[in-house]
Amino acid sequence: MMSKDKPQIPSGEKMLDIPEGLWTKCPGCNRFLYTKELELNQSVCHYCQHHFPLKAPERIACITDPGSFIECEKHLHSVDILGFNGEKSYQERLDYYRNKTALDEAVVCGSCTIGSIPVFLCVMDFGFLGGSMGSVVGEKITRMIEKSLSAKTPLLIISASGGARMYEGMFSLMQMAKTAAALQRLSQAHVPYISLLTNPTMAGVIASFASLGDVILAEPKAMIGFAGSRVIKETTQQELPPGFQTAEFLLEKGLIDKIVHRKELRSTLKQLLYFLT
């Protein structure tokens, strides 16, 4: 009688030791991508063109002239002004994300050139506390607006945020009015402001400076809105249009000016800056 035992793997063979992070699964098409190739492609899927998140330094490298970026306001740091208590203190969270991201805050600001045109630049990083806007984020952005106004130099803000930072309470909500007021002065002086919305741009950020650009761009399929769809549905008791918080829906309704593929972003910005300056 033949044995029905399962074949045994020879003891001499070992499982392959695959380094962690070698492959990345695309949420758009579920394919596995070689991480190094993905990074060389500006973190855009080769197959479905899904745009993965970028860290602030990566975004800066993608759009600025090489070696032109000079960081400003790096000395500003958030503090736990309210003594926020939770599972972890606010200070513990700040320390954790500073170590994790090698950033001081959720926004990196500075001066640069794009196509040899001087620009003041603010780039938010969702990896730092969800890109949330606290008092320091609001202050850094406001200072860059004021620098732009003083130098009559175009301003570019790249948003990636879940909204206001709850650990700072009203201090974070105040930044909405502060940044909006500063942008009003910039507008009155006819200094160009370009806003780029990336995935996600939500809540207090889209309700303030992110939606006030002279030109508003967005990355493909970026999630953009004030509240989450579940909250809106429960509040209004109405069925919501499919994809109503995507860049494509907002473009159709006229709330943004153009959707720009990441590979075309630098050339698009160069053209816009040329026309606006």
From Swiss-Prot:
A GO BP entry: fatty acid biosynthetic process
A GO-annotated cellular component: acetyl-CoA carboxylase complex
Binding site for Zn(2+): 26, 29, 45, 48
Chief location: cytoplasm
A GO molecular-function descriptor: ATP binding
Cofactor: Zn(2+)
Catalytic activity: N(6)-carboxybiotinyl-L-lysyl-[protein] + acetyl-CoA = N(6)-biotinyl-L-lysyl-[protein] + malonyl-CoA
Pathway: Lipid metabolism; malonyl-CoA biosynthesis; malonyl-CoA from acetyl-CoA: step 1/1
PROSITE patterns: COA_CT_NTER
PANTHER family according to UniProt: ACETYL-COENZYME A CARBOXYLASE CARBOXYL TRANSFERASE SUBUNIT BETA, CHLOROPLASTIC
Function: Component of the acetyl coenzyme A carboxylase (ACC) complex. Biotin carboxylase (BC) catalyzes the carboxylation of biotin on its carrier protein (BCCP) and then the CO(2) group is transferred by the transcarboxylase to acetyl-CoA to form malonyl-CoA.
Family (UniProt): Belongs to the AccD/PCCB family.
The protein's name: Acetyl-coenzyme A carboxylase carboxyl transferase subunit beta
Native source species: Methylacidiphilum infernorum (isolate V4)
Primary gene name: accD
